[in-house]
């Protein structure tokens, strides 16, 4: 397989690099987990959208550039290499949008995607519940049929971006008589300011609300905000889960850029005689490059069923390895949340490490992903379930 980019793709890379060089904020934005920082990040989304860089692989009619998936990977490489801000639009652009493009109606795409691309609508993900995490099919929140739509009731937790987002998408049990837990589910979108919705932010160790609980009490959702066929929500949700676990939410460019930062840190902070740390840095660089080439191969060959599970295993463990190595290079300075005195450039490694610890858990635990890879990619028999 030829993994080299064409001259046209290299021209696109140069165009993206030039635009980012002229527009990426020189001063880091405040944390998106604060009200001020969220507003700054939403403004950045508008800047991206103004020149159609917010969703380059979307059709032009929805605010994109009509570029290929491979070119999106190239843009992501340049985006993270430029030190651009985190994307508060990631749930909408990276998760909901691919789902709507596959399962949504033309009306839904025309109504929702342009507002998502522009940052006008920022989305939260409402999957997990107090008793339904990786075992999502055991969810208890319900959708009850009513005239012209559905009434949603229940509780969602660990809802990313919900503290400041505008809307959310989630899964609800609409047909209680269905035999299997994966059946009888409906995929619905709802406003976080709708009557009957209460959002309770969940603070991190630093007190910032990275997540929130969402309580729903007979929240009306019109039929036009149901994605796919009512009762067939599990199939729709698996499209979203594939995006979350795969390349879309955690593109290789993010880790290639992190590996470069790790090398820069090693050059200023490493003990020249510590060959073990040197080898760990080299290993992280090689793994990031392998992930990059894997992304190119996926773009060329298309999806292969359970490959998002394989991808999720790779990026979550790579992310953790990058940050663990950085903290070991920093030594005592690794405890710092920001720059201080004569400390080597910290690069946000401490905060990133805390987030990376959750990587093997969210988007479906890595244990579950290994089961999926074993059964669907390797053809092994199903393991025993406790």
What is the role of each PLM region?
Residues 49-110, 114-119, 161-167, 288, ...:
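Internal helix-loop-helix
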Residues 28-35, 271, 275-278, 289-342:
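C-terminal helix-coil-helix/basic helical segment that borders enzyme active sites and/or dimer interfaces
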Residues 7, 197-291, 359:
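Glycine-rich beta->alpha junctions and the first turn(s) of the following alpha-helix
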Residues 74-75, 95, 236-240, 244, ...:
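Glycine-rich phosphate/cofactor-binding loops in nucleotide/flavin-utilizing enzymes
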Residues 119-127, 170-171:
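A short, Trp-centered hydrophobic/proline-enriched beta-strand micro-motif
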Residues 153-199:
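A short core secondary-structure module
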């Amino acid at each position: 397989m030829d993994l080299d980019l064409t001259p046209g793709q290299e021209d696109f890379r140069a165009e993206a690099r030039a635009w980012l060089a002229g527009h990426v904020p020189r001063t880091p934005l405040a944390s998106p987990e604060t009200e001020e920082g969220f507003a700054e990040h939403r403004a950045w989304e508008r800047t991206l959208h103004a020149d159609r860089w917010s969703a380059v692989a979307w059709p032009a009619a929805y605010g994109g550039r009509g570029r290929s998936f491979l070119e999106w990977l190239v843009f992501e490489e340049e985006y993270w290499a430029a030190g651009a801000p985190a994307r508060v639009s990631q749930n909408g652009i990276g998760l909901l949008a691919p789902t709507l493009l596959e399962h949504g109606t033309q009306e839904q795409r025309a109504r929702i995607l342009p507002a998502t691309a522009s940052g006008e609508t920022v989305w939260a993900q409402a999957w997990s519940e107090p008793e339904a995490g990786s075992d999502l099919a055991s969810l208890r929140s319900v959708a009850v049929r009513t005239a012209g739509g559905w009434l949603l009731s229940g509780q969602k937790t660990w809802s990313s971006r919900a503290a400041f987002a505008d809307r959310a998408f989630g899964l609800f049990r609409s047909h209680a008589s269905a035999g299997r837990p994966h059946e009888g589910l409906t995929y619905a979108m709802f406003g976080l300011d709708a009557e009957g919705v209460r959002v309770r932010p969940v603070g991190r160790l630093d007190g910032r609300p990275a997540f929130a609980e969402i309580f729903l009490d007979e929240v009306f959702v019109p039929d036009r905000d149901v994605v796919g066929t009512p009762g067939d929500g599990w199939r729709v949700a698996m499209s979203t889960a594939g995006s979350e676990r795969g390349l879309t939410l955690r593109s290789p460019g993010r880790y290639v850029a992190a590996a470069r930062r790790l090398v820069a840190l090693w050059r200023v902070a490493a003990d020249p005689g510590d060959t073990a740390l040197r080898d760990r840095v080299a290993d992280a660089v090689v793994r990031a490059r392998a992930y990059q080439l894997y992304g190119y191969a996926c773009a060329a060959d298309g999806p292969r069923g359970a490959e998002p599970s394989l991808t999720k295993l790779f990026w979550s463990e790579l992310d953790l390895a990058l940050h663990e190595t950085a903290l070991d290079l920093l030594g005592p300075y690794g405890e710092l949340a920001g720059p201080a005195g004569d400390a080597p450039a910290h690069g946000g490694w401490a905060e990133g490490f805390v987030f990376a610890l959750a990587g093997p858990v969210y988007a479906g635990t890595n244990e579950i992903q290994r089961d999926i890879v074993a059964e669907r990619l390797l053809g092994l028999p199903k393991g025993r379930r406790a």
